[in-house]
Amino acid sequence: MAEVEEQGRKLSEESTDESEEEDTEEEPKLKYERLTNGVTEILQKDAASCMTVHDKFLALGTHFGKVFLLDIQGNVTQKFEISSVKINQISLDESGDHVGICSEDGKVQVFGLYTREGFHENFDCPIKVVALHPQFSKSNNKQFVTGGNKLLLYERNWLNRWKTSVLHEGEGNITSVKWRGNLIAWANNVGVKIYDIGSKQRITNVLRDNTSLRPDMYPCSLCWKDNTTLIIGWGCSVKICAVKERDPTEMRDLPSRYVEIVSAFETEFFISGLAPLADQLVTLYYVKENSDHMEEEFRTRPRLDIIQPLPEGCEEISSDALTVRNFQENQCRDYRLEHSEGESLFYIISPKDIVVAKERDQDDHIDWLLEKKKYEEALMAAEISFKNIKRHDVQKIGMAYINHLVEKGDYDTAARKCQKVLGKNMDLWENEVYRFKTIGQLKAISQYLPRGDLRLRPAIYEMILHDFLKTDYEGFATLIREWPGELYNNMAIVQAVNEHLKKDPTNSILLTTLAELYTYDQRYDRALEIYLRLRHKDVYQLIHKHNLFSSIKDKIVLLMDFDKEKAVDMLLDNEDKISMDKVVEELKDRPELLHVYLHKLFKRDHHKGQKYHERQISLYAEFDRPNLLPFLRESMHCPLEKALEICQQRHFVEETVFLLSRMGNCRRALQMIMEELANVDKAIEFAKEQDDRELWEDLISYSIDKPPFITGLLNNIGTHVDPILLIHRIKEGMEIPNLRDSLVKILHDYNLQILLREGCKKILVADSLSLLQRMHRTQKKGVRVDEENICESCHTPILPSDTAQAFGVVVFHCRHMFHKECLPSPGSIPGIQYCNICSAKRRGPGSGILEMKK
């Protein structure tokens, strides 16, 4: 089989024009191989004159009057000696059980292949064509036609005799005939006719276009595409005819069917054969010697084209020039094209050669892609059609692609394709790794090595890591981060890194990688030391992930120096593992760090670190004065005397004022504001906060000889102190800045207060009236008294069991009920009775509203 394929490929290479192959990269549509075996021996001694194709076998006629039955591979299965001269045509029925043969000496034989019984006749003229009814074996009246100088129809009657009918004559020799269903198509010197055997009517006559061509040299090619579509090729003309049913209303004396030419076009070369291929046409061309379209040495090579018919033309899909044996000696009439409808096989028959053309399958497509070095497309095609390919293996194609990429020097792509191609084959993986090592490209393949459930031997990974350690520290660090620690011997790699650190002890990349290796090996203390030494950002993640708090108790200062915020957050979040006292003890010699820790602790919880609040006063004063006053305001545990002492030593006026006021020495605090800050606004604000008349007096006394202070007081005192007190104490003749504006503001504020009071009074009166009316409406409503109610004094039912007797009940607005005799005597105000229960809480709502008597 491999020999046949190689022969086919060789023929295909021979049959494709080399100049066109250089210009185009289009993949051929068909592949070719010679029909060999018994055919080769036959054609060495004889020459092929005709051939008919059946799905099961082939029938070959020769110039020496012999007919050979062949299998699909060309082996001879049967041989018939029919005549001593050329066999003109062979016809088979659909079942392949009967054959019809005609020869140049006028012999016609129709017989069964499994029995020689049949029709045997000698005519006095050459018989050019013969055609059996497609259902010859199954029909009772066996029918066939022969054509010489006239077309004769033979059918066997009920007496088992052959009846002859002339279908056509008088227009020269019949050169071609094709029978499909009930339709017989034939060609003579004038044109093509179609006869309906069912209605016994000739339904069309398609005239031949180029009458200058000799019919015997350029015979007509007929081919049925289906039961109603006939393809006619004659000379350089192609016509596609559709047989259609005629409308019964238009028949009159016309046949029941008619023919419509649906497509007609001219070709570049002479047509030797036609065959359908789906909705396209396969055409066999004879190229005349005087054609200017081809090179001199290829002028008479036949061509096999695939064309797409259009209504008024055609489009060429593919074109192959075929090198058949002795093609230089052949004429147009020497070529024939036969096809097998079942398998889309096309047979090109010439006197000394038979070539089989077939559609290319997926294997052929991949062959072509590999030949053109389109390995990626070949790999993709193989993956998509892996169930249908027979000669190719996806992995082998992938390996060829990888080899091609390596040869090109595209190592990165080659390494990337290894993942897809090598898959789970660990032996192939190891071979590729060693190949990449040989060419010095381990770096390219390293990132694609298996690292999941399927793994290579640890030695492979270690080899790559050692190679990176020699040439690329960053690449080595990347692999250590990306590869799981189980892939290689961790201790061996640690030892190798330590050897390199002896040469370069400060290399941060190697140190970081060593810390990661220690982490994989669960030696977290060593990893932590390296991270702290390098101030690496992952140190906190390492501590949290592996719970290394016991290892950092003596390294708190280092952590704080690296990142105060992260360190403090971590320490505060894990107080159960590192106590607050331990942290304070470690930071006692670094007060600035201690302040950061205690400050965040205070922000989280004002009471948790209360025993350190006294120490925090000096820390705030030293390192963070802006937060000292908020601390003093919020802390309930700092000693005020100590705080006052520190603030006075450092002359922190605002903090001292706050402490004095908190300790009750408001006058001293106000004095400091006026004397040391000289800020009347703050003094006024302080006096407002304390709301102490004596402080206001002190403030006025201190400000009375200071015009700017008087202005500030006039602008702000109106709502707290009567401005007249201040105005009366102003000395006559004292010049006060913006006095008029201040007085206007005082009057405006006074008017505003009066308006507010009046407005409030109106609202109060309106609300009081509304509430009084609502209460009056409520009190006017009746109160339900029934057997379920009880006296709040004696706790017996409020209504007597015998309602016919006289009784008295008192019901209050509070809904408490009493028997009249159970109430105490009225109060000091005659006529007003109070509820005993509610009068202890308030007066008024419990006044009696209803007295029931009966």
Swiss-Prot record:
Subcellular location per the Swiss-Prot or TrEMBL entry: Endosome membrane; Late endosome membrane; Early endosome membrane; Lysosome membrane
Deleted gene: phenotype: Disruption of the gene results in melanocyte pigmentation defects, decreased body length, and bladder defects associated with abnormalities in surfactant production or distribution, consistent with abnormalities of lysosome-related organelles. Mutant animals also have defects in the optokinetic response and eye movement control system, suggesting cerebellar dysfunction. Microglia from mutant fish show morphologic abnormalities, with larger or more numerous lysosomal compartments and increased expression of acidic lysosomal markers compared to controls.
Zinc fingers typed RING-type, residue spans: 791-839
Domain of life: Eukaryota
CDD domains: RING-H2_Vps41
Alphabetic keyword roster: Autophagy, Coiled coil, Cytoplasm, Cytoplasmic vesicle, Endosome, Golgi apparatus, Lysosome, Membrane, Metal-binding, Protein transport, Transport, Zinc, Zinc-finger
InterPro entries documented for this protein: Clathrin_H-chain/VPS_repeat (IPR000547), TPR-like_helical_dom_sf (IPR011990), VPS41 (IPR016902), Vps41/Vps8 (IPR045111), WD40/YVTN_repeat-like_dom_sf (IPR015943), WD40_repeat_dom_sf (IPR036322), Znf_RING (IPR001841)
Major subcellular site: membrane
Membrane topology, from the record: Peripheral membrane protein
Annotated Gene Ontology cellular component terms: clathrin-coated vesicle; cytosol; early endosome membrane; Golgi apparatus; HOPS complex; late endosome; late endosome membrane; lysosomal membrane
Family according to the record: Belongs to the VPS41 family.
Stated name of the protein: Vacuolar protein sorting-associated protein 41 homolog
Organism of this sequence: Danio rerio
